[in-house]
């Protein structure tokens, strides 16, 4: 068993190009219709297989390591248990994505952990089996495991591959932490958007049902979105706080970024319908 470090496993961010809430289920979860697309801004993970079963996480973000409920460690432990794998792993996380911004960074880190360790441990689970493990940890994890842009329904677990335009995006990360649980519990959240077929959804203007509520409660999000809308069609991703504008070229997105007010943080990224994780898996 090699002690070499397997490097450069990407955990890409995602954008919700639209997000519709169709109702609330008896178990408290919400029925959704959403469109996921990856962007080329990623956290990065390295792994070293160990003979002993311990799972050790290092990170440039001390808050990640201090979190005993960390999704990376939970994902690795779940794969260990599902396969009765006797060894363990040492994991290094370089955190580049904003935390808690609606970009799916934590879910993506967990998905990359499952995919990478499944290969490095040679546990030979299928993508379906990995996605089933991931779904128990978080509704967004399966889309990162499958690695293709997808139309999602249910609580986000029913996925259909799609190929939306791969725009350039200017993503702004407001200085606000939006609680996903609080958004979905808020009585003012719209919950009755009609379910529509994928062809209709793909051809109509896109919107995020959480956006108006979050904008009304978080002035930093309102300010960022208001500024971005002056330059491009723009929306919020997930339950926020990040917002994104669509540009047809990198040059246009960078030109807008150059004008970003000094009290805002942002970056330019390319939309990707195939995850960088899939590229890493097939071209190590």
From Swiss-Prot:
Keyword check for Cell division:
no
**What function does the entry list?**
Catalyzes the phosphorylation of the position 2 hydroxy group of 4-diphosphocytidyl-2C-methyl-D-erythritol.
Which catalytic residues are annotated? 14, 140
What reaction does this catalyse? 4-CDP-2-C-methyl-D-erythritol + ATP = 4-CDP-2-C-methyl-D-erythritol 2-phosphate + ADP + H(+)
Q: Which domain of life is it from?
A: Bacteria
Q: Determine if ATP-binding is one of this entry's keywords.
A: yes
Pfam families per the record?
A: GHMP_kinases_C, GHMP_kinases_N
**Which keywords describe this protein according to UniProt?**
ATP-binding, Isoprene biosynthesis, Kinase, Nucleotide-binding, Transferase
The Swiss-Prot or TrEMBL record describes its family as follows:
Belongs to the GHMP kinase family. IspE subfamily.
Name the record gives this protein = 4-diphosphocytidyl-2-C-methyl-D-erythritol kinase
Q: Recall the GO molecular function terms of this protein's record.
A: 4-(cytidine 5'-diphospho)-2-C-methyl-D-erythritol kinase activity; ATP binding
* One Gene Ontology biological process: isopentenyl diphosphate biosynthetic process, methylerythritol 4-phosphate pathway
- Which species is the source of this protein? Shewanella sp. (strain ANA-3)
């Amino acid at each position: 068993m090699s002690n070499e470090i397997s490097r450069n496993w990407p955990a890409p961010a995602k954008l919700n190009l639209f997000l519709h809430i169709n109702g609330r289920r008896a178990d408290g979860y919400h029925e959704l219709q959403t469109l996921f697309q990856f962007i080329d801004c990623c956290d990065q993970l390295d792994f070293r297989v160990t003979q002993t079963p311990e799972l050790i996480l290092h990170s440039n973000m001390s808050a990640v390591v201090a979190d005993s409920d960390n999704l990376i460690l939970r994902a690795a432990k779940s794969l260990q248990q599902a396969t009765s794998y006797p060894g363990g792993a040492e994991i290094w996380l370089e955190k580049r994505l904003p935390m808690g911004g609606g970009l799916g960074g934590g879910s993506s880190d967990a998905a990359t952990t499952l995919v990478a360790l499944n290969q490095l441990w040679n546990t030979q689970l299928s993508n379906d089996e990995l996605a089933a493990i991931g779904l128990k940890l978080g509704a967004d994890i399966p889309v990162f495991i499958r690695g293709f842009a997808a139309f999602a329904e249910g609580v986000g677990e029913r996925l259909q591959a799609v190929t939306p335009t791969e725009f350039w995006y200017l993503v702004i990360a407001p200085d606000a932490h939006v609680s996903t649980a609080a958004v979905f519990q808020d009585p003012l959240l719209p919950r009755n958007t009609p379910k529509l077929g994928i062809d209709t959804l793909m051809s109509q203007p896109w919107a995020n049902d959480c956006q108006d509520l979050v904008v009304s409660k978080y002035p930093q999000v309102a300010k960022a979105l208001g500024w971005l809308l002056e330059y491009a069609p723009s929306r919020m991703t997930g339950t926020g706080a990040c917002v994104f504008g669509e540009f047809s070229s990198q040059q246009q997105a960078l030109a807008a970024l150059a004008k970003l007010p000094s009290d805002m943080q942002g970056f330019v990224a390319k939309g990707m319908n195939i995850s960088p994780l899939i590229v890493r898996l097939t071209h190590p």
